[in-house]
Design a protein with these regions (language model features):
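C-terminal accessory region of radical SAM enzymes
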Residues: 194-228, 253-303
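Short, acidic, Ser/Thr-enriched surface-loop or helix-capping motifs
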Residues: 248-251
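Radical SAM enzyme core and accessory elements
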Residues: 287-391
Length: 391
């Protein structure tokens, strides 16, 4: 588990069309760095691993960023930060080098591919900042959310991936679009078939490259390893406690993962042991009723992230079920064609079902203590250029 520290809460300098944090901003849930002493105490109590997140963490003052990263260096943290990349300046670069910060940048490609996030001018500046950080020896990874705009300009996106690889990026996380508002639904949402076609194109384009790409790497692990090291969306997340995320706001209070926060209210984080109740229910609920009963890939998908559930109700499976099933099935077929041994689907499902009905202290998800979002998952998305989890 990794702690996400939000030094400016969910404040951001951009207004991305599809941002899942918008309900929190609409509800007025902003905070400022008022009590870093309390924040440090919360980080230590949570295990001492943390990354800076937002909103946009680079809205914090240089003084505060220095204090936070120096604290991370002091306790032996793998310092990391997730940013949109627009505000990066030479002082930030010096700070990142000083404290060995792994920087994750959220960008959906060049030009029109990224127009749901920023203007063409800002996108060019972000790309320049990425290249500049890489040239200074800073480890950079990318989150690329796949949607109608970059799917429409897929050739530009693939060239961008190639350019970023040549510049030194070794870790890419291709996100499935989370649809939480009408504008996203109307302008960016892909059909299941279109979404599958876009991800499949990226899969085949990157397959032979010397880079790590999610979700493809995770899916291969889920299909070939009994206890794989995978990111949070594959872990059977409890939406009440979100065990992969111990968010800490600027006042030092613990919060849950923002992806399940559909009302914009940061409820006080539960101290309860994570429950597998959602997955016990999905396992026995028919497909027509929003469940996953008898799905051959339930052990791998687990109904996916509760933040993407049908009707925003985490009791349901993901609304993107057809897309994920198709992608998993394609990758399984490719593994078989390549002669890679894959798990027996029936046995894998039986193992997973046994695990979710075990006593809480013996329940096992496939999260393997993955620092949330990274190395390399769904939120914080920085990496150390290593393909293995951090020690």
């Amino acid at each position: 588990m990794t702690v996400e520290y939000l030094p400016v809460g969910v404040k951001c300098n951009l207004k991305c069309t599809y941002c899942y944090q918008e309900p929190m901003r609409d509800a007025g849930n902003f905070s400022v760095p008022l009590n870093f002493v309390r924040v440090k105490d919360s980080i230590i109590k949570s295990g001492g691993k943390f990354a800076l997140f937002g909103g946009e963490p680079l809205l914090a003052t240089m003084e505060h960023l220095e204090t936070v990263l120096a604290f991370g260096t002091e306790i032996g943290n793998h310092n990391g930060l997730q940013t949109n990349g627009l505000l990066v300046n030479p002082d930030h670069v010096d700070l990142f080098k000083k404290h060995k910060v792994h920087v994750g940048v959220s960008i959906d490609g060049p030009g029109l591919c990224n127009s749901a996030r920023s203007s063409d001018f800002d996108t060019e500046l972000i790309i320049s900042n990425i290249v500049g950080m890489l040239q200074e020896g800073i480890s950079v990874s990318l989150i690329i959310t796949v949607h109608a705009l970059n799917a429409m300009h897929m050739r530009d996106l693939l060239f961008f991936i190639d350019d970023m690889e040549k510049a030194g990026v070794r870790f890419f996380n291709f996100h499935n679009l989370e649809v939480d508002n009408h504008l996203t639904d109307f302008t960016l949402k892909l059909s299941d078939t279109e979404n599958f076609r876009a991800f499949a194109t990226i899969y085949w384009h990157t397959k032979r490259k010397d880079i790590d790409c999610l979700p493809f790497k995770d899916i291969r692990s889920l299909l070939t390893v009994e206890k794989p090291y995978v990111s949070c969306i594959w872990s059977g997340c409890d939406p009440i406690t979100t065990p992969a995320v111990q968010g800490i706001n600027a006042e030092g209070s613990l919060t849950n993962c923002g992806r399940t926060n559909k009302l914009g209210i940061d409820w006080i984080k539960s101290n309860n042991y994570p429950s597998m109740e959602r997955y016990q229910a999905l396992a026995i609920t028919p497909y027509a009723k929003g469940g996953c009963k008898d799905c051959e890939y339930f052990f791998a998908c687990k109904g996916q992230c509760p933040g993407t559930a049908i009707d925003g109700d985490w009791r349901n499976r993901t609304k993107d079920c057809v897309f994920w099933y198709s992608l998993i099935d394609m990758i399984r077929g490719d593994l078989v064609d390549d002669g890679v041994p894959v798990l027996d689907l029936k046995e894998a499902n039986q193992r997973f079902l046994r695990s979710i009905y075990a006593p809480p202290s013996r329940q096992q998800t496939q999260h393997s203590d993955t620092p949330h979002g990274d190395y390399h998952g769904d939120h914080t998305d920085f990496t150390s250029n290593a393909s293995q989890p951090p020690k």
